[in-house]
C-alpha cells in the first residue's frame, strides 16, 4: 500500500501540469471576450449587420457617343520662315554717315535706312555733267561746220572728202555725247546709292556696322538683315503616302487650311493656307516638303520658330465620336465599356478611326447615344453595376468605396 501512494502522487502531478499547459494554450489562441449579456448581444447584432451589408457601387464617369463633322488633318513638324529675307548691303564705298532705323523696327519698302558720305559722288556727277556740256558744245560747232560744208560742196568750193570728214566728225561727237550721258547717269546712280533704302517691307534686325565705319560694296555681312514677316511662311514635311490625299483635296479649288500649333501641340497659334508643295520627294526620309502662308499681322509667328503644322485634307460627316479616355486596348484590339439602361457595364470591341488627345472616331461597334465609361475603368468587371457620377464627386465616391462597410472586420 505504501508503494502505491507515491506512484499515484506522481501521476496526479503529471495530470495537473498537462491541464495547466492545455489551458494556457487555449487562452493564448482565444483571448477573453466581454462577458456581459449586453456586449454579447451587441456583438451578435453587429456581426449580422456586417455579414448582410452590400458593398457600394463602383463610381464611374460616363459620356455619350455623339455624331460630329470631324476634320481630317495631316501633321508635321514645321519651321517658320520669312516670306523674304534680304541682307542690305551698300552698293558704293564710303564712310557711313548716319543710320535712320531702330533695331527691330518695322520698315516699308523705299524707307531710308542709312546714308554714306555723298560728296565724292556729287563731285563725280559734276565732272560727268561738265564733260557732257563740253562735248555738246563741240557737237553744235561740228554741225554748223557741216552745214557750211554742205553749201560749199554745191558750188564745188569744198571737196567731197572734206564733206565726208565733217560728217564723220559730227557722228563721232554724237557717240561721245552718248558716252557722256552714260557717265552722268552712272554718277547720278552712285549718288542715289549713297542713300541706302529698304528693298522690302519687313522687320530690321541688329545693325552690323556702326556710324563712322568705311563700308564697301563687297562687304558680305552687310548693314542689316530685313525679314518680311507680314506674311510669313511655315515649311513642314509629310509622308509621301499622303501626297494623293493632298492632291485630291486641292481639286476642290478651295485653299487648304493649315493650322500652326505650339511646340507642345496643346495651343492653336494661328491659321493659314497651303501655298505650295515641293516638286520632289526627299528619298532619304520619304517625305515631301510643304509650304503654308500665314497673314501674321499679330506677329504670333517668328522666323525659325518651331511649330506643329496641321493640314486639313478632309472632313468626315456624321462620324460617331467618343472621348479618347474611353478607348481601351486589349489583347483582341480596341474596346470600350458600355453602360446599359440598368447601369450595368459590358465590354464591347470597336474599330477606332481618327483620333487626337481629346476625341476618337469610332468607325464600327458603337452607335450615337451609347454611354461609355470615361473614368473609373480600373475596377470594372463584365456585368457589374456601377454608379455614374459627375467629375467633381468621383473622388469622394472612390474614398467611400475604399473604406470598410459597417460590420466588416478591420
Swiss-Prot record:
Its main location: membrane. The keyword Chloroplast does not apply. One of its GO terms (molecular function) is efflux transmembrane transporter activity. The keyword Membrane applies. Keywords: Cell inner membrane, Cell membrane, Membrane, Signal, Transport. SUPFAM superfamilies: HlyD-like secretion proteins. It is a peripheral membrane protein. Pfam families: HlyD_D23. One of its GO terms (cellular component) is efflux pump complex. It is found in: Cell inner membrane. Belongs to the membrane fusion protein (MFP) (TC 8.A.1) family. This is Multidrug resistance protein MdtA.
Amino acid at each position: 500500500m505504501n508503494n502505491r501512494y507515491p506512484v499515484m502522487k506522481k501521476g496526479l502531478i503529471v495530470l495537473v501540469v498537462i491541464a495547466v499547459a492545455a489551458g494556457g494554450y487555449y487562452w493564448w489562441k482565444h483571448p477573453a471576450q466581454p462577458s456581459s449579456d449586453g456586449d454579447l448581444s451587441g456583438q451578435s447584432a453587429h456581426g449580422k449587420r456586417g455579414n448582410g451589408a452590400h458593398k457600394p457601387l463602383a463610381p464611374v464617369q460616363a459620356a455619350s457617343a455623339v455624331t460630329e463633322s470631324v476634320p481630317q488633318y495631316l501633321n508635321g513638324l514645321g519651321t517658320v520662315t520669312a516670306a523674304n529675307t534680304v541682307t542690305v548691303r551698300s552698293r558704293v564705298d564710303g564712310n557711313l554717315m548716319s543710320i535712320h532705323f531702330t533695331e527691330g523696327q518695322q520698315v516699308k519698302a523705299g524707307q531710308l535706312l542709312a546714308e554714306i558720305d555723298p560728296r565724292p559722288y556729287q563731285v563725280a556727277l559734276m565732272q560727268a555733267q561738265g564733260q557732257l556740256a563740253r562735248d555738246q558744245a563741240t557737237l553744235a560747232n561740228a554741225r554748223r561746220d557741216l552745214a557750211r560744208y554742205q553749201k560749199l560742196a554745191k558750188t564745188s568750193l569744198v571737196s567731197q572728202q572734206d564733206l565726208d570728214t565733217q560728217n564723220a566728225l559730227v557722228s563721232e561727237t554724237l557717240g561721245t555725247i552718248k558716252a557722256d550721258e552714260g557717265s552722268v547717269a552712272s554718277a547720278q546712280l552712285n549718288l542715289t546709292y549713297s542713300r541706302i533704302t529698304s528693298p522690302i517691307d519687313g522687320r530690321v534686325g541688329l545693325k552690323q556696322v556702326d556710324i563712322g565705319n568705311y563700308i564697301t560694296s563687297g562687304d558680305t555681312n552687310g548693314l542689316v538683315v530685313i525679314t518680311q514677316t507680314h506674311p510669313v511662311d511655315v515649311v513642314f514635311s509629310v509622308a509621301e503616302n499622303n501626297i494623293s490625299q493632298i492632291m485630291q483635296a486641292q481639286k476642290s479649288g478651295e485653299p487648304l487650311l493649315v493650322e500652326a500649333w505650339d511646340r507642345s501641340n496643346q495651343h492653336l497659334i494661328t491659321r493659314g493656307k497651303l501655298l505650295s508643295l515641293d516638286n520632289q520627294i526627299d528619298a532619304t526620309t520619304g517625305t515631301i516638303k510643304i509650304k503654308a502662308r500665314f497673314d501674321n499681322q499679330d506677329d504670333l509667328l517668328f522666323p525659325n520658330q518651331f511649330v506643329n503644322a496641321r493640314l486639313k485634307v478632309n472632313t468626315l460627316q456624321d462620324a460617331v465620336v467618343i472621348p479618347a479616355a474611353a478607348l481601351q486596348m486589349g489583347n483582341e484590339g480596341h474596346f470600350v465599356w458600355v453602360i446599359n439602361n440598368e447601369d450595368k457595364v459590358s465590354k464591347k470591341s470597336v474599330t477606332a478611326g481618327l483620333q487626337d488627345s481629346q476625341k476618337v472616331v469610332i468607325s464600327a461597334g458603337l452607335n450615337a447615344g451609347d454611354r461609355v465609361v470615361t473614368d473609373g475603368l480600373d475596377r470594372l468587371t463584365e456585368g457589374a453595376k456601377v454608379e455614374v457620377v459627375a467629375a467633381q464627386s468621383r473622388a469622394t465616391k472612390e474614398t467611400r468605396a475604399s473604406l470598410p462597410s459597417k460590420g466588416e472586420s478591420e
